[in-house]
A protein has these predicted regions:
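Juxtamembrane low-complexity tails/linkers enriched in Ser/Thr-Pro and polybasic
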Residues: 1-3
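N-terminal Sec-pathway targeting helices
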Residues: 5-20
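Charged, low-complexity helical/coil segments in non-catalytic cytosolic or luminal regions
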Residues: 17, 26, 30-49, 85-243
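OB-fold nucleic-acid-binding modules
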Residues: 43-63
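Envelope-exposed proteins and targeting segments
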Residues: 63-69, 89
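OB-fold and OB-like beta-barrel modules that bind single-stranded nucleic acids
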Residues: 67-74, 179-180
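Soluble extramembrane regions of membrane proteins in the secretory/endomembrane system
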Residues: 78-81
Length: 243
């Protein structure tokens, strides 16, 4: 019977662990790519509607299924602020507040502590105004029913001594693309849930779903994660030499 040295066993363990890990990573990547491809096909095969209220109405009444509709999204009761109109507007009040923390340092084996003072802008109040309904291609929808309407920072205004106001909102009358599904006779999410609002044209929305470009972006992130975990596995195996 051939006996293996401890170092050879460690090498085999490392090689085996890395091989198994690579196989799992490849399988995960394959599943992820297939998921992206399904999403891309779902958007690509949907009915495209370009600023056509009649076609949009027809798609709902005939329950055609997936739709990508492009048009203007407008608030029923817009909120005005500094010359512009918004579907919803948020005002955050912040106070410049003093805080303290204990900082401990060790030099030449001697540990000392001191109190450090620092300041941050802390939220003390939040107000939100919103149009209850929005209009899109002559159809009314509850604003809360639409997903993807992400607020954007508008401006920061001084409120006096140690007070400031942050304003965020979603601008009214934007040209958007809504991804939805009309299989039930109403507009739902294209793959379930709520219809999604994109601030892009139909062609740009479909291009953003391209699985190859999305996978390329994700691969960079996954590669870093893979390397960190692989190095951790190797580190654990090598660390076992101490025992």
């Amino acid at each position: 019977m051939i006996k293996m040295s401890k170092s050879n066993k460690e090498r085999l363990l490392i090689v085996g662990a890395v091989i198994i890990y690579i196989l799992l990573a490849v399988i995960f990547r394959s599943f992820y790519y297939n998921s992206l491809l399904d999403d891309y096909k779902l958007y690509g095969q949907s009915l495209k509607i370009h600023n056509d209220p009649k076609k949009f109405d027809y798609a709902i009444k005939t329950k055609v299924g997936g739709v990508l509709a492009e048009g203007k999204l407008s608030a029923e009761t817009p909120i005005s602020f500094e010359g512009k109109k918004y579907i919803f507007l948020e005002k955050i009040t912040e106070r410049y507040t003093m805080h303290t923390r204990t900082v401990t340092t060790t030099v030449n084996g001697k540990t000392t502590s001191r109190t450090e003072v620092y300041y941050t802008w802390d939220e003390i109040d939040r107000e939100t105004k919103q149009s209850k309904k929005v209009s899109f291609l002559n159809k009314k929808f509850n604003t809360d029913y639409m997903a993807g309407m992400y607020e954007k920072h508008i401006c920061t205004r001084s409120g006096g001594y140690k007070i400031r106001y942050q304003y965020n909102g979603y601008e009214d009358n934007q040209n958007v693309t809504i991804a939805g599904n009309t299989r039930t006779g109403k507009v739902e999410g294209i793959d379930g849930g709520y219809p999604m609002v994109y601030e892009n044209s139909i062609s740009d929305v479909i291009a953003s779903k391209n699985p190859d470009s999305r996978l390329l972006l994700a691969t960079g992130v996954f590669t870093v994660i893979y390397l960190v975990i692989a190095l951790a596995i190797i580190g654990v195996i090598l660390d076992s030499r101490r025992f």
